[in-house]
């Protein structure tokens, strides 16, 4: 069983800049079995061989967090809470923040929404140190990573329709994604050619088979929710790395970007907790470092709904008009979520001294919030 636990301090260096992913070497065809090996995630770097590795221990690298919003609509209060926690965590540790706009999906390719998002972050006083970087400018990096996986025989074309994947009888993973049962895993070359003539396939990544059930568990320690584990074969299945329309899957793109940008700490909503084992698996296959993960509770409306851009719940247009100043909004939000002892207006900088992961851990459950 592989144990991949996030350490409290990081000794990696930020060798790869956002324009270039370090280590374009090949992936071993036996890589799925390599996940059975206990790894020192502080030392992994596919650009450095063991013989060339330095003998002296590097000083701990500074914390590098990130904002990674999608411009699919105006930011809502839940997005603000996530960005605020990421910013406060990094700043409280003397770290920096990278801004990345995740706009691969067609519905996110709206420059006016990206510009509004950037303006909202600046208005809130959540300053970033690098970026913004746009995923639509980084397709060559994702293509390179996918080719490495394909060359190692770790992927295969999948022709399953959405209706087939979402069949009522199909089991689903913790994040609602159908657990793929491998219908296209072992198609012959002739059958692949026949189906390809009818429709474009998606691309799936192989995970260790159920025969390796005792050994395919991905384990990590989340800063909020503690020890987590997932058996890839039974709780996830082979997962997409590229959609049938050619768009790179979220799991692959964020893994490539987080490594290239030197991200050491990922703070995001607990709805993405279930994605983490897949991302750690990809990091291992590609020889990339594993960041420290911290998932936070979601903000919920009084009727039990998760706040969403689609429903325009407490979006920043409404919130900016209502509160007038970023200090008033952030102070109110910090008081509502117990980051601060009360709702006194405070700037993001003033909230740094109040921030503690102990408070976030104390919540664990999602937080019901209103604009009253």
Q: Where in the sequence are the language-model features?
A:
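Cationic, low-complexity basic patches in intrinsically disordered or flexible, solvent-exposed regions
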Residues: 20-21
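Non-catalytic terminal extensions that flank enzyme cores
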Residues: 26-73, 92, 97, 193-194, ...
């Amino acid at each position: 069983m592989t144990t991949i636990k996030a350490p409290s301090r990081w000794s990696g260096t930020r060798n790869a800049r956002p324009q270039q992913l370090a280590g374009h070497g090949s992936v071993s065809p036996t890589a799925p079995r390599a996940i059975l090996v206990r790894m020192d995630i502080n030392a992994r770097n596919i650009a450095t061989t063991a013989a060339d590795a330095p003998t002296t221990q590097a000083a701990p690298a500074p914390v590098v967090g990130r904002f990674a919003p999608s411009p699919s609509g105006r930011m809502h209060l839940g997005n603000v809470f996530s960005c605020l926690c990421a910013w406060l965590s990094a700043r409280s540790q003397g770290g920096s923040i990278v801004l990345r706009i995740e706009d691969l999906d067609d519905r996110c390719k709206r420059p006016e929404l990206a510009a509004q998002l950037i303006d909202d972050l600046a208005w809130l006083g959540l300053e970033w140190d690098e970026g913004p970087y746009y995923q639509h400018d980084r397709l060559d990096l994702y293509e390179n990573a996918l080719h490495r996986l394909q060359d190692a025989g770790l992927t295969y074309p999948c022709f399953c329709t959405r209706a087939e994947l979402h069949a009522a009888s199909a089991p689903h993973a913790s994040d609602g994604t159908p657990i793929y049962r491998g219908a296209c895993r072992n198609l012959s070359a002739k059958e692949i050619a026949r189906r390809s003539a009818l429709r474009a396939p998606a691309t799936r990544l192989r995970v260790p088979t159920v025969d390796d059930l005792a050994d395919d568990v991905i384990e990590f320690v989340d800063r909020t929710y503690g020890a987590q584990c997932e058996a890839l074969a039974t709780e996830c299945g082979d997962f997409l790395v590229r959609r049938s329309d050619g768009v790179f899957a979220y799991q692959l793109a964020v893994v490539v970007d987080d490594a290239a940008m030197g991200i050491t700490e990922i703070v995001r909503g607990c709805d993405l907790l279930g994605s983490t084992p897949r991302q750690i698996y990809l990091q291992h296959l590609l020889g990339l470092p594993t960041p420290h993960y911290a998932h936070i509770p979601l903000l919920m409306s009084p009727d039990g709904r998760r706040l969403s851009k689609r429903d325009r719940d407490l979006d920043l247009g409404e919130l900016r008009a209502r509160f007038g100043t970023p200090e008033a909004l952030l102070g109110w939000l910090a008081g509502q979520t117990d980051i601060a002892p009360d709702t006194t207006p405070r700037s993001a900088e003033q909230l740094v001294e109040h921030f503690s992961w102990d408070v976030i851990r104390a919540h664990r459950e999602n937080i019901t919030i209103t604009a009253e």
